[in-house]
Amino acid sequence: MLAVGAMEGTRQSAFLLSSPPLAALHSMAEMKTPLYPAAYPPLPAGPPSSSSSSSSSSSPSPPLGTHNPGGLKPPATGGLSSLGSPPQQLSAATPHGINDILSRPSMPVASGAALPSASPSGSSSSSSSSASASSASAAAAAAAAAAAAASSPAGLLAGLPRFSSLSPPPPPPGLYFSPSAAAVAAVGRYPKPLAELPGRTPIFWPGVMQSPPWRDARLACTPHQGSILLDKDGKRKHTRPTFSGQQIFALEKTFEQTKYLAGPERARLAYSLGMTESQVKVWFQNRRTKWRKKHAAEMATAKKKQDSETERLKGASENEEEDDDYNKPLDPNSDDEKITQLLKKHKSSSGGGGGLLLHASEPESSS
């Protein structure tokens, strides 16, 4: 328990140190030293490994009589002299405590001077890093900064794989090269609905996809007939849609009943005929225009006929009045102009018999 308390105290002091090289040394010592030395059997005495011997030869040799199994330099401060006292131990089992997990060496962090990766021989990695820190001050400062980042909670979590529940997983690469993805992208590119896109079949109601028995499939209005085509100049050219005989017959019968369609009626008629509402609306507009022109022409013809009949009747009535005057007997007290007109009309109709009538009338008047 004393060793555990000492380790916790040194770990807390390592975070509080202001010198980066000292913080690096203490963090490496914490990674090297186990928390429970009594739980692990000591290593059998034997010759040191080649890596530790090479690292110890490169580092300055400690004074004789001092026990320094890790190859670390004795710390300059007296409060940190208990770091090298526990012997180096290798874990015989896998501890799962919180302190054990936190004391595990973290993954190497990419920096100016990379730390050596964690391996079973912790003494060789720590001794080599301490030797490089003592050889060059610049390398020691970089290693200290990297060790401080590794010893911090962010550095401990840096080597772990990151999983974010808020970010969705990356989509498979085939999504961007499939026809369905291209259709979805086309909807984003074109603001019009999918029924009006070039080369796309219109989206009808579910019952319209199964054509009714009275509809002729050969003469039915196909979606490509009303699609947008491009001229050789690159300009848009709208083709005129053609309708089947059954569709025109139903439209004409509906137009005879009513000249204008409300919204629900237009939608119902378009659904029953397999047409779009815009097609029905445009057809009724064109049909009303045609009906107005035809009605205006008929009215003009009827007016002309009525005017001609009126003139004929007027002329006939005038002739009848003249005939009535001619058929009446001659009044001797009438004016000379009227008598002259009657004589001229009589000459034109009967020839030379007018003189006889005149002579015959004179004796009667004289007597």
Swiss-Prot record:
Transmembrane segments: none annotated. Its main location: nucleus. Residues 236-295 bind DNA. PROSITE patterns: HOMEOBOX_1 (PS00027), HOMEOBOX_2 (PS50071). Residues 48-59, 78-91, 110-133 have a biased composition (Low complexity). Residues 36-133, 294-367 are annotated as: Disordered. Coiled coil: none annotated. One of its GO terms (cellular component) is extracellular exosome. GO terms for biological process: animal organ morphogenesis; cell differentiation; cellular response to cytokine stimulus; cellular response to peptide hormone stimulus; central nervous system neuron differentiation; glucose mediated signaling pathway; negative regulation of oligodendrocyte differentiation; negative regulation of transcription by RNA polymerase II. Pancreatic beta cells. Residues 306-367 are annotated as: Involved in DNA-binding. It is found in: Nucleus. Keywords: Activator, Developmental protein, DNA-binding, Homeobox, Methylation, Nucleus, Repressor, Transcription, Transcription regulation. The keyword Transcription applies. SMART domains: HOX (SM00389). Residues 304-317 have a biased composition (Basic and acidic residues). InterPro entries: HD (IPR001356), HD_metazoa (IPR020479), Homeobox_CS (IPR017970), Homeobox_NK-like (IPR050394), Homeodomain-like_sf (IPR009057), HTH_motif (IPR000047). Residues 102-268 are annotated as: Repressor domain. The modification Asymmetric dimethylarginine is found at R189. Transcription factor which binds to specific A/T-rich DNA sequences in the promoter regions of a number of genes. Involved in the development of insulin-producing beta cells in the islets of Langerhans at the secondary transition. Together with NKX2-2 and IRX3 acts to restrict the generation of motor neurons to the appropriate region of the neural tube. Belongs to the class II proteins of neuronal progenitor factors, which are induced by SHH signals. The C-terminal domain contributes to sequence-specific DNA-binding. This is Homeobox protein Nkx-6.1. The gene is NKX6-1.
